[in-house]
Amino acid sequence: STQAKTLFPYTTLFRSWLPSFIRSWTPGVYTELYHSLKTGKLVEQRVLSGPFWLNLQNGGTIGSYIEASVQNLEEPFNPVGIRISPGMFKYTRAGFMLENDPSAKYYVSANYEWGGYYNGHLTYMELSSRIAPIPHINLGVSYQQNQFDGVGDLRGKKQVNLIQFDSRFALNPRLQLIGFYQKNTSDALNSLNLRLAWEYQPLSYVYLVFNQSDFMGSDLTKQKVQTFLTKLSYLKQF
């Protein structure tokens, strides 16, 4: 597919009537268009508007948004095991979010969305936090809840909860261990990713990557796959 994006310049407003804890008000509109290379038909269109978007003096953000979507599925789509047959779908969603300064030692954010989703409805909530007590350590945790109602060919209901943990430990800027763990509490499916990155000389790296993930097989039984990857890159500068 081809992709076209349009970002209308966000208007940054500084006004004396804004409360002192608000740095600026930045409303804007963002659009995306995707077309099929085979047929030239529109595959996906998104228009996202953030009329109420406030940047705070402490580096945080409070915002609300509305998103209108058009999805033209050319093949069946199966999010979280829910089958959606090909067709044209139009729906609108709304949401709000708030966060403190992402660069702060302690970071917290919240996001809540509701509205249409293909031929049904989806309510989404995410809470996340991160702590970076020293530059060498970064730890994060998040919780997501997805409630599907009337989505898919069977028009059923399903709730999917995800718990995620991520970490970064750096002995120095050249040697880092990065980890990610996700648990799907609804289907008891887990995934783990560990990556060791070592820059043994400028712009030359050694990567060691371990992946383990659970998935539901075609026979609806829980299955597991493990992979281990190594990568060596070398750059000689003249």
Predicted regions and their residues:
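Short, small-residue-biased leader/transition segments that mark boundaries at the very start
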Residues: 2, 6-13
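Exposed, low-structure sequence patches enriched in small/polar residues
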Residues: 14-238
